[in-house]
């Protein structure tokens, strides 16, 4: 168990040493009795221009936690709630067919990765190109080249956010958030996205994160197919039995009974097909 301290303030140039000193002061302890000080939440208070500062929540490892909290007598100090790690639901799938995920933006990548970790060997279909080729296609367009309707700033590995500055929009109270952020960190994102109020990966790192997620899916037995666009569904009653996929000028049929759609916001042809 650890002690949680809220509303610690830190100047913009404050470092880990200063944060530890402030935590020790809030607990009425010497710095030497602080074993670890882990940021949990960080936001910026810029209401007064002459006093811009960080507002931090930290978890502190100390001995005799309950006694420390009682002695502090502060609303800022409490015992940390025990974290509840995300556990993927038990898989009882009996179908011999692999689940299919459409779209390789954040939702599609994480869905495919979760299925791969569960041993289901998913197939991830992406109408656009792999990130390496996609970057070339977009840069060529920006230099005056032709628009590739399937490989551009909207379509391709990583989704529309690949060409943004890498800000992550998250539901801060969703218990699965920590699992998602830890997945990004394990794939190469900066560790501070775990506690920043507005987490920011950065375009350069975001591209490496996306590539690493794809490689992990493949290493776990999943398949990733670029240049493959979902174009149709076949149902028997209300049960999905097949999907149609366009690969360039060729259309093929793929047996499928489980389909996760994560096409993003610009696949209007897919939306029309689904109607």
Q: Locations of the language-model features?
A:
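Residues forming the flavin
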Residues: 1-54, 58-275
């Amino acid at each position: 168990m650890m002690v949680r301290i809220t509303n610690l303030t830190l100047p913009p140039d404050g470092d880990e040493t200063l944060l530890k000193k402030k935590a020790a002061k809030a607990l009425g302890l010497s710095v030497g009795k602080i074993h670890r000080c882990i940021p949990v939440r960080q936001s910026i208070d810029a209401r007064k221009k002459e006093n811009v500062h960080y507002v931090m929540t930290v978890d502190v490892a100390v001995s005799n936690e309950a006694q420390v909290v009682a002695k502090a007598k502060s609303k800022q100090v409490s015992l940390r709630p025990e974290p509840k790690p995300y556990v993927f639901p038990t898989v009882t799938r009996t179908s011999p067919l692999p689940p299919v995920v459409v779209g390789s933006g954040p939702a599609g990548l994480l869905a495919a990765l979760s299925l791969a970790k569960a041993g289901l060997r998913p197939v991830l279909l992406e109408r656009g190109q792999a990130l390496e080729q996609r970057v070339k296609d977009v840069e060529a367009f920006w230099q005056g080249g032709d628009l590739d309707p399937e490989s551009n700033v909207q379509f391709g590995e990583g989704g529309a956010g690949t060409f943004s500055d890498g800000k992550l929009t998250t539901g801060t109270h969703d218990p699965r958030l920590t699992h998602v952020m830890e997945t990004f960190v394990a794939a190469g994102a900066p560790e501070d996205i775990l506690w920043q109020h507005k987490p920011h990966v950065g375009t350069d790192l975001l591209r490496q994160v996306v590539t690493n997620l794809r490689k992990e899916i493949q290493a776990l037995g999943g398949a990733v197919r670029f240049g493959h666009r979902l174009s149709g569904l076949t149902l028997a009653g209300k049960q999905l039995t097949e999907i149609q996929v366009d690969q360039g000028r060729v259309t093929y049929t793929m047996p499928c009974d489980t389909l996760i759609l994560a096409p993003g916001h610009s696949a209007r042809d897919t939306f029309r097909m689904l109607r």
